[in-house]
């Protein structure tokens, strides 16, 4: 495989990136420094139930359970101030999230802070997957194990 560093290569890379963003089954969401949604892919629509038109420009509170918001925004501000997460690079975070219909789901995600051309923090991108079924299976297994110990 060769790499064309010219315009054709840039166009091909742009087309490839757009295809990945639009066809990923995982939610890919980008938000600005204030936590307003800048990008919302079809995977995010599938997982959370909001289409892009509903999500763009909205606060991430859209998908964050109310009692977790203060903690979320504390971490978000830390990343925006420092450019680094308290979690290691590539670590999966597991948290509850909200769907449009109000149901809680469990998601795993990674975050990627992004900067502008001047090196200033501009926002955060996240790749998320719904792990609700796996979380519920683990909870059921723990209950069964606890019941057998009694």
Language-model-derived ranges and their functions:
Residues 109-111, 128:
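Sensory-domain boundary capping and coupling elements
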Residues 120-130:
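PAS-family sensory domains
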Residues 10-35, 39, 43-45, 89, ...:
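Sensory modules in modular signal-transduction proteins
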Residues 9-11, 15, 135-150:
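Sensory-domain boundary/capping and coupling elements
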């Amino acid at each position: 495989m060769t790499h064309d560093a010219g315009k054709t290569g840039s166009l091909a890379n742009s087309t490839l990136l757009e295809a990945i963003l639009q066809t990923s089954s995982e939610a890919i969401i980008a938000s600005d420094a204030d936590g307003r949604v800048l990008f919302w892919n079809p995977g995010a629509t599938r997982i959370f139930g909001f289409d892009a038109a509903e999500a763009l420009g909205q606060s991430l509170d859209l998908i964050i359970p109310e009692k977790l918001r203060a903690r979320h925004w504390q971490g978000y501000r830390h990343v925006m101030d420092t450019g680094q997460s308290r979690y290691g690079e590539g670590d999966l975070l597991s948290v509850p999230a909200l769907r449009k219909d109000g149901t809680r789901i469990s998601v795993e995600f990674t975050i990627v802070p992004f900067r502008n051309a001047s090196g200033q923090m501009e926002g955060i991108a996240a790749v998320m997957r719904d792990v609700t079924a796996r979380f519920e299976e683990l909870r059921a297994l723990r209950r069964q194990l606890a019941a057998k110990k009694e």
